[in-house]
């Protein structure tokens, strides 16, 4: 038994923890949970816990349904919202076959596999997400437009605002769980908020994002309001994204930094960026996986609709921040295409793999875009070689299903299930008769 397992067992006993929740996600990024009693924890570390894998989206086929959930003791934390004298803890888990092999449908394993390839090349992949979400008043009929809890705007200080208190409570709870937060503030939309997690390796950050979503939902329930990570909940307000800052380190050195080069970008950084732009359309269905995601991408308000990069250009898909231009360890690039309901394990897998492919293939990064890409004409964008991202889930899926690259990164099992599920979602959406159609056409047609 290793020290992390011993720590978890000792803490459970000393803190009188009565339930240990074992967390994992399905292929779509939905959190799954099973609770075990303290008496079962040691056996769970040694042998795992059996479950029906076919009952979880994309995990396995019915004919191969016996699977094992194996807790990762390094992720052990007490859940603050389940406090009291008899508390609850949680751990993230890896999914294994009865033979002890990683499940092909486990998103956490997909990311571990991508990180292992980076490690073989001497790289550690760090990410830093800026997570946006809306706070609405509770309502019973969600077919009607939601009501934001305030009318604040970007960086607004709203005295005695429920949103300000909400952010404070969220940050405090995250830090109780060992999740460091850099910033929190009101965003541009009414009732829209942003909380930025401190950078960490991609696997830790993906786990933290799943915890973050749960914390936000728990606090909203306690306070009688509704928190939503929906990418575009309001037609006339900015959508919610999850802009993510990316960096590669070689040991203690930032591989993206080279003093004296344009924007202090090393050749490694330029090739990594070129790889992401090269594969951007192929991976779009993974980074933006819902029908609603494309209403954010194509809704303006600094959303990135076109495949380009720029220095301090928030209309670009990939931005090179220059907050601290002379500080090597701060060198990074910001991918602005992600939304907050992406499966973080799969999203970070395809982003890392795309960047590494750029390095392996020695791809050349084109010229940066300084213009607001939305203000350019189609002819101007074409002359500059700027291509659009897919404008719908359907368009994104048609590109992804032809991609050997994405199939290789996700693995055929997860790749095929993801496509099948998302094609079904598009078919369901396409078959709807919307309120817009009824209002516009029914009276006169």
Regions found by a protein language model. Give the residues of each.
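Glycine-rich, acidic/polar active-site loops that bind/position phosphate-bearing ligands
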Residues: 1-445
């Amino acid at each position: 038994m290793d020290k992390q397992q011993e720590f978890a067992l000792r803490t459970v006993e000393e803190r009188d923890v009565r339930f240990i929740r074992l967390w994992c996600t399905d292929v779509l990024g939905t959190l799954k949970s099973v609770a075990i009693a303290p008496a079962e924890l040691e056996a769970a570390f040694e042998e795992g816990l059996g479950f029906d894998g076919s009952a979880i989206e994309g995990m396995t086929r019915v004919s191969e349904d016996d699977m094992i959930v194996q807790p990762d003791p390094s992720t052990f934390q007490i859940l603050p919202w389940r406090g009291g004298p008899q508390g609850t803890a949680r751990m993230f888990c890896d999914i294994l076959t009865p033979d002890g092999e990683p499940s092909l449908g486990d998103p956490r394993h997909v990311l571990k596999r991508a990180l292992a390839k980076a490690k073989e090349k001497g790289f550690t992949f760090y990410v830093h997400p800026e997570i946006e979400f809306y706070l609405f008043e509770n309502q019973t009929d969600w077919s009607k437009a939601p009501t934001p809890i305030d009318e604040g705007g970007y960086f607004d200080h709203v005295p005695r605002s429920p949103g300000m208190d909400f952010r404070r409570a969220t940050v405090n709870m995250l830090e109780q769980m060992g999740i460091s937060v850099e910033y929190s503030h009101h965003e541009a939309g009414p009732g829209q908020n942003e909380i930025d997690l401190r950078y960490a390796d991609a696997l830790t950050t993906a786990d933290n994002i799943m915890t973050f979503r749960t914390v936000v939902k728990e606090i909203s329930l306690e306070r009688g309001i509704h928190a939503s990570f929906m990418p575009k909940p309001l037609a006339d307000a900015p959508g919610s994204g999850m802009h993510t800052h990316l960096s590669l380190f070689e040991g203690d050195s930032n591989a993206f930094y080279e003093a004296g080069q344009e924007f202090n970008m090393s050749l490694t950084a330029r090739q990594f960026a070129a790889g992401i732009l090269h594969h951007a359309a192929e991976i779009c269905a993974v980074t933006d996986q819902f029908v609603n995601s494309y209403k954010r991408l194509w809704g303006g308000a600094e959303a990135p609709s076109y495949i380009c990069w720029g220095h301090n250009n928030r209309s670009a898909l990939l931005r090179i921040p220059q907050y601290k231009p002379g500080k090597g360890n701060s060198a990074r690039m910001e991918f602005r295409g992600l939304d907050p309901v992406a499966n973080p394990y799969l999203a970070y897998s395809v982003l890392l793999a795309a960047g590494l492919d750029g390095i392996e293939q020695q791809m050349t990064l084109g010229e940066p875009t300084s213009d607001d890409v939305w203000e350019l004409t189609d002819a101007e964008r074409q002359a500059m070689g700027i291509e659009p991202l897919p404008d719908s889930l359907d368009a994104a899926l048609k590109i992804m299903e032809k991609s050997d690259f994405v199939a290789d990164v996700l693995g055929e099992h997860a790749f095929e299930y993801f496509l099948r599920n998302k094609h079904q979602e598009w078919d369901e959406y396409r078959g709807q008769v919307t309120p817009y159609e009824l209002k516009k056409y029914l009276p006169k047609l």
